[in-house]
Swiss-Prot record:
More about this protein: A lyase-type mechanism (elimination/hydration) is suggested for the cleavage of the lactyl ether bond of MurNAc 6-phosphate, with the formation of an alpha,beta-unsaturated aldehyde intermediate with (E)-stereochemistry, followed by the syn addition of water to give product.
Classification lineage: Bacteria, Pseudomonadati, Pseudomonadota, Gammaproteobacteria, Enterobacterales
Catalytic activity: N-acetyl-D-muramate 6-phosphate + H2O = N-acetyl-D-glucosamine 6-phosphate + (R)-lactate
Sequence ranges assigned to domain SIS in this UniProt record: 55-218
Active site positions, chain numbering: 83, 114
Chain's gene name: murQ
Pathway of action: Amino-sugar metabolism; 1,6-anhydro-N-acetylmuramate degradation; Amino-sugar metabolism; N-acetylmuramate degradation; Cell wall biogenesis; peptidoglycan recycling
Lineage: superkingdom: Bacteria
Protein's recorded name: N-acetylmuramic acid 6-phosphate etherase
MF annotations from Gene Ontology: carbohydrate derivative binding; carbon-oxygen lyase activity; ether hydrolase activity
Family note: Belongs to the GCKR-like family. MurNAc-6-P etherase subfamily.
Length: 298
């Protein structure tokens, strides 16, 4: 697909005079365009749901969720991956973010990195990609060689693959087994796909990782019950989570957390089933770490 024919490279009539308006009007134009992004994502919810189910199945079988992208797309993948361990208590290697050009490219532009097909393949080889893994290729344009080659290599290995782009009929969409294509239209600044396209990608990634964690028992109700208390804010959040899940007071919640080495799930089961820490942990282990299953009457 030729670059000039891509929707993400089109000219947006709503912002044609944006360099001549007041600062407030400039903000209104950008905001009005941003409002269209969730609607574009809404139109592809069935595709997102299908991808979540596949990702969950693979991760449940011992696989990993791997994001692959260049520039803004790569950085968004890294951002999503890096938030999973503290939020959901998973090991750092379960959700992986790879970016064309490597770690240096997180903060700097690396010329030619996104055009390297070899780079996409080598980065996946370097993390020991296996058929159990799911590779999610992210590219607003849908034409990034680094991402396309990575998806091709992943499929050759037998991996399940997902392609996220904002141009229908793109190479990324056709290469991946599952395509997620929120069409957000032309950007406020022509071709600046870090804006609406990047926002759409972030919303999709939020759903993929959050959906995976919910289906993996990392959420009880709407509480992040595997959160790791790495700072004072999260320490307080743990107490509030146990309080909200059980109806106990702060002192009881803190006592339960101390008794089980600050594991919210265990503390919740301790309080609700009147068990000690070891008994509660054993009960959770017997039910795959799912609180709801652990609370069901035998």
């Amino acid at each position: 697909m030729q670059l000039e024919k891509m929707i993400t490279e089109g000219s947006n009539a709503a912002s044609a005079e944006i360099d001549r308006v007041s600062t407030l009007e400039m903000c209104r134009i950008i905001n009005d365009e941003d409002k269209t992004v969730p609607l574009a994502v809404e139109r592809v919810l069935p595709d997102i749901a299908a991808a979540i189910d596949v990702i969950h199945a693979q991760v449940s079988g011992g696989g990993r969720l791997i994001y692959l992208g260049a520039g803004t797309s790569g950085r968004l993948g890294i951002l999503d991956a890096s938030e999973c361990p503290p939020t959901y208590g998973v090991k750092p290697g379960l959700v992986v973010g790879l970016i064309a050009g490597g770690e240096y490219a997180i903060q700097h532009a690396v010329e030619g990195a996104e055009d390297s097909r070899e780079g996409g393949v080598n980065d996946l080889k370097n993390i020991g990609l296996t058929a159990q893994d799911v590779v999610v290729g992210i590219a607003a344009s849908g034409r990034t060689p680094y991402v396309i080659a990575g998806l091709e290599y992943a499929r050759q290995l037998g991996c399940r693959t997902v392609g996220i782009s904002c141009n229908p009929g793109s190479a990324v969409s056709s290469t991946a087994e599952f395509a997620i294509t929120p069409v957000v239209g032309a950007e406020v600044v022509t071709g600046s796909s870090r804006m609406k396209a990047g926002t759409a990608q972030k919303l999709v990634l939020n759903m993929l990782s959050t959906g995976l964690m919910i289906k993996s028992g990392k959420v009880f109700g709407n509480l992040m019950v595997d959160v790791v208390a790495t700072n004072e804010k999260l320490h307080v959040r743990q107490v509030n989570i146990v309080k909200n899940a059980t109806g106990c007071n702060a002192e009881q919640a803190e006592a339960a957390l101390i008794a089980c080495e600050r594991n919210c799930k265990t503390a919740i089961v301790m309080v609700l089933k009147n068990l000690d820490a070891d008994e509660a942990k054993k009960c959770l282990d017997q039910h795959g770490g799912f609180i709801r299953k652990a609370l069901e009457k035998e």
